[in-house]
Amino acid sequence: MVMEVGTLDAGGLRALLGERAAQCLLLDCRSFFAFNAGHIAGSVNVRFSTIVRRRAKGAMGLEHIVPNAELRGRLLAGAYHAVVLLDERSAALDGAKRDGTLALAAGALCREARAAQVFFLKGGYEAFSASCPELCSKQSTPMGLSLPLSTSVPDSAESGCSSCSTPLYDQGGPVEILPFLYLGSAYHASRKDMLDALGITALINVSANCPNHFEGHYQYKSIPVEDNHKADISSWFNEAIDFIDSIKNAGGRVFVHCQAGISRSATICLAYLMRTNRVKLDEAFEFVKQRRSIISPNFSFMGQLLQFESQVLAPHCSAEAGSPAMAVLDRGTSTTTVFNFPVSIPVHSTNSALSYLQSPITTSPSC
């Protein structure tokens, strides 16, 4: 398989893109989060779950490498002269893990996409971005908006939600999670100047008492849950994810907020990343925390996210064990997740010293 794959360095790929960009398909085999932080312009992210990888047993089908049917059809029809595979920094394809994304993608392309020449990018994205930064798209991390755009607070923000006028917990402004998804507090949601500066077209209000200040200007989705251990936020995951996707598909941007932008709204953003990108909770948590450092979903919400993870990543697991939000997900086997997260809700215990639980939390979601 390796003998069928050519090698390009950064200069070679630059020349290829300059001559035949429309006939060159770039497949980035890094994680979703690495790809989102920066990638070669026009490249496509290749990713699949560990369950799919395990089932493949070293022979991944092209439908998993290029899941977009139209793109895959063009590839099989010979519309692409070259397909270039890359990871973060590998110097040679033969050094890639046999069950890794890069090797599995190369194998599938060599077996099924015979009309195109397959290449491996030596040095990966790291080398190419250093040599040709103008051909790469990068997201600044964290990306936020500074607070003092104006000192006035709308009249509508002075009642119904006390935090709107006292953002003492805020560290900076709203943050970009994805190009179409932003996270922040009720105070940010009361600042039309901030929302307009970010290009926001819709808001998800994850609270029972914070008002929707500008219903004549933006589309709103209300999720009336409290930030406590009794609240079932997972039953709203599907609706929230569908709403975000509908705004994204319409070319809009969604701002998700609760009162403080710490627990409820962060939980919705985490669920969105986990479901749409099939990543584990700890990966999604680290990704969001890098952008808004004060996030801290309460202990119950973390448990609901873990249940969500077990069913998102394990398609054989019994969906009946999860919340209503999981009814349409695949089923799979259970997984064990170990992580360290701060939690902000009091934990009821006979020992009063344990008024707040600090991890590590070890959880084995069960089917």
Swiss-Prot record:
Entry comment describing in which tissues the protein is expressed: Expressed at high levels in the lung, liver placenta and pancreas. Moderate levels seen in the heart and skeletal muscle. Lower levels found in the brain and kidney.
Any one GO CC term of the record: nucleus
Domain Tyrosine-protein phosphatase span(s) in chain numbering: 173-314
Active site (record annotation): 258 (phosphocysteine intermediate)
Stretches assigned to the Rhodanese domain: 20-137
Catalytic activity entry: O-phospho-L-tyrosyl-[protein] + H2O = L-tyrosyl-[protein] + phosphate; O-phospho-L-seryl-[protein] + H2O = L-seryl-[protein] + phosphate; O-phospho-L-threonyl-[protein] + H2O = L-threonyl-[protein] + phosphate
Keywords linked to the UniProt accession: Cell cycle, Hydrolase, Nucleus, Phosphoprotein, Protein phosphatase, Stress response, Ubl conjugation
EC number in record: 3.1.3.16, 3.1.3.48
Induction entry: By oxidative stress and heat shock.
Gene3D superfamilies xrefs: Protein tyrosine phosphatase superfamily (3.90.190.10), Rhodanese-like domain (3.40.250.10)
Keyword Phosphoprotein: yes
GO biological process, alphabetically ordered: cellular response to chemokine; cellular response to hormone stimulus; endoderm formation; intracellular signal transduction; negative regulation of apoptotic process; negative regulation of cell adhesion; negative regulation of cell population proliferation; negative regulation of DNA biosynthetic process
UniProt PTM comment: Phosphorylation at Ser-359 and Ser-364 by MAPK1/ERK2 and MAPK3/ERK1 reduces its rate of degradation. 'Lys-48'-linked polyubiquitinated by NEURL3, leading to proteasomal degradation.
Record PTM Phosphoserine, positions in chain: 359, 364
Listed Pfam families: DSPc, Rhodanese
PROSITE patterns per the UniProt record, alphabetical: RHODANESE_3, TYR_PHOSPHATASE_1, TYR_PHOSPHATASE_2, TYR_PHOSPHATASE_DUAL
Family listed: Belongs to the protein-tyrosine phosphatase family. Non-receptor class dual specificity subfamily.
PANTHER family given in the database record: DUAL SPECIFICITY PROTEIN PHOSPHATASE, DUAL SPECIFICITY PROTEIN PHOSPHATASE 1
UniProt-recorded name of the protein: Dual specificity protein phosphatase 1
